């Protein structure tokens, strides 16, 4: 039993080849919606955190600011809910740069690394099953263990 009419291969190909929307239409900010503002300090901080050169020209800073604003407009569109009144400031929370997230940590030394390795325990939440032996692996239907020749 068919719910809809059957389509031939050429009809399906034509249907899929015909664009129904364009991403460029989503990159332009609709009228009446506030464009997220990004200042130069945010751009420099993002570049520094990303490990990129943060001493760039004004033109490059302007280009990056415009690109980030365009991305935020697009992401705002992705999070739009047609059934609920749109609150334009809600998505700005996703782009906060919190100082605590990017604090420089104290470098680990060999002793600290060895201690953390020795205290590791398998986590069932992560799907870790603990220690295993070659005998257990050979009997498991999901693994094939072959001896080296």
Curated annotation (Swiss-Prot):
GO molecular function: ATP binding; glutaminyl-tRNA synthase (glutamine-hydrolyzing) activity
Keywords per UniProt: ATP-binding, Ligase, Membrane, Mitochondrion, Mitochondrion inner membrane, Nucleotide-binding, Protein biosynthesis
Pfam families: GatF
Protein's name in the database: Glutamyl-tRNA(Gln) amidotransferase subunit F, mitochondrial
EC category name: ligase
Family the UniProt entry places it in: Belongs to the GatF family.
Membrane topology of the entry: Peripheral membrane protein
Catalysed reactions, as listed in the record: L-glutamyl-tRNA(Gln) + L-glutamine + ATP + H2O = L-glutaminyl-tRNA(Gln) + L-glutamate + ADP + phosphate + H(+)
Coiled-coil annotated residue ranges, if any: none
Gene: GTF1
Keyword Lipid metabolism: no
Misc. remarks from the entry: This protein may be expected to contain an N-terminal transit peptide but none has been predicted.
Taxonomic lineage: Eukaryota, Fungi, Dikarya, Ascomycota, Saccharomycotina
Binding partners and assembly: Subunit of the heterotrimeric GatFAB amidotransferase (AdT) complex, composed of A, B and F subunits.
């Amino acid at each position: 039993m068919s719910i809809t009419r059957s389509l031939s291969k050429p009809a399906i190909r034509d249907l899929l080849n015909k664009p129904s929307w364009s991403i460029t239409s989503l990159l332009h900010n609709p009228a009446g919606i506030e464009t997220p503002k990004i200042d130069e300090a945010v751009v420099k901080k993002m570049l520094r955190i990303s490990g990129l050169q943060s001493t760039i020209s004004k033109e490059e800073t302007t280009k990056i600011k415009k690109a980030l604003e365009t991305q935020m407009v697009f992401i705002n569109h992705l999070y739009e809910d047609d059934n609920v009144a749109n609150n334009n400031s809600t998505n700005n929370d996703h782009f906060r740069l919190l100082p605590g997230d990017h604090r420089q940590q104290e470098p680990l030394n060999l002793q600290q690394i060895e201690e953390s390795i020795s205290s590791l325990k398998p986590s069932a939440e992560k799907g870790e099953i603990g220690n295993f032996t070659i005998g257990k692996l050979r009997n498991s239907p999901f693994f094939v263990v072959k001896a080296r020749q």
